[in-house]
Amino acid sequence: PTYILGSLTANGRVILINQSGVIFGNGARVDVDSLIASTLNLTNQNFLNNMFSFENLGGSGSILNEGQLKAFSGGMIALVAPVISNAGTIQVDSGTAGLFAGDKVTLALDGNRLVKYTIDQGTLNALIQNNGAIKVAEGLVVLSAKGVEQVSKSVVNTGGLIAATGITEVGGKIILEGDEVTL
C-alpha cells in the first residue's frame, strides 16, 4: 500500500492511486486544493482526457484515513475504493467530501469541483465506515456504497461526526447511499 505518514501540501489537485491500498496514518496531514485517492485503476488515456472513471481490475485494496485531510476552499476530497474507513478528519470549505465504494466509479469534475458522480458497478461487500469526522462548510458530503445486485449488500456505517453547514441559501447537504445505512 501507499502510506502517507507525514505532511502532503499542494496548490493543485493531487491524485494517489495504488491498487494495494492507500493509508493516511495517524499524524498524517494533507493540505491540498483537491485530493483523489483510489485503489481502483485510472487509465492513462482517461487521465489525459480529464475523465475520472476508476475501475477495479482485480484485487483492489482499501483506503484507511487516520490523519487530517483538508481541501482548500472550493476544493474536494474524494476517496474511491471497494472498502473505505475514516477514523481521522476530512475537512472541506465550500466544496465536496465524497467517499465512494464500488468497483467502477466515475467522477465528473469542473475544475476541482465535483459536479456529478456515479457508481457504475457495485462490488462484493462494499463498505464505508466513518468513525472520524467529516466537516464541510457550505458544501456537500457524499457517502455512497454500491454492492453487486442480488449477491451482496453495501453498507454505510457512521458512528462519527458528519457535518455540512452553511449560511448561504443553499447551505450544506449530506447524502448517505447504500443498501444498509447505520447512523
Protein language model features and the residues they cover:
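Extracellular and secretory-pathway beta-repeat/beta-biased strand scaffolds
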Residues: P1-L183
